[in-house]
Amino acid sequence: MAANFSDIADSAYTRAGELRTRALELAEIELHAFVPVLEALRLPRDDPERAARVSAAKTEASQSPLEIARVAAEVAELAAELARTGNPNLTGDAIAGALLAEAAAQAASRLVAINLADGPVVEEAAALALRADAARDRALGN
């Protein structure tokens, strides 16, 4: 909504639409991403391939929340820009967008950390959550 009335409306509106489309795609992917993990966990505990299959499934299942964190960070940054430069009557909408995007980035980052415990993907997800956090602060004027 805030993108419809700002000086940067055309590019912001277009990018927001692209991000919305990607977020919806990722939500659909995320619905099914954990199924292979559950299947691997159902293998007998003494199966020699169980640990490797669980690990591989968790790594793969972490890709969609990582991408969700990436999209959410960009949404938060776009919302922060709109909060600062957009139509003053819609600043609240932009701030709400930044807050929601930051929450999505944090949640997605936590899912990655839960699945993988540590490593470069966890660090990347945490960095994306921090980007969203900084954007939220900018949107709030902090």
Pin down the residues of each PLM region:
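A structural-propensity feature for long, helix-poor, extended segments
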Residues: 2-43, 136
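Acidic-enriched, low-complexity/disordered segments with a strong bias for Aspartate over Glutamate
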Residues: 7-10, 46-47, 77, 93, ...
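Amphipathic alpha-helix face/heptad-repeat signature
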Residues: 12, 19-22, 26, 61-71, ...
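Amphipathic alpha-helical interface segments
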Residues: 30-99, 103-109, 115
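C-terminal auxiliary extensions adjacent to catalytic cores
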Residues: 108-142
